[in-house]
């Protein structure tokens, strides 16, 4: 999956480009690093989603730059069930904690 990063640290957007060359703009929900997997992860949601719509969050691992940020490098699909379970647990913690999710 190819990606292009636009914006600054407060308003990061990523354009995902699928195998057919279709582009879709996503907002960065948050990023984190897992010491267990020694990888950085980014969670994204579609930029065009309305406030009252359910959103589908997508997660990828990525190669962080020197400051730990998402770069324009390729995103990597998460392939193992254990890794998906870890990412889902982090997302659930984020969504359940009002201080983190901004509820």
From Swiss-Prot:
Origin: domain of life: Bacteria
A Pfam short name: DUF1292
Matches recorded under InterPro entries: UPF0473
Sequence similarity: Belongs to the UPF0473 family.
Protein name: UPF0473 protein LBA0420
Organism: Lactobacillus acidophilus (strain ATCC 700396 / NCK56 / N2 / NCFM)
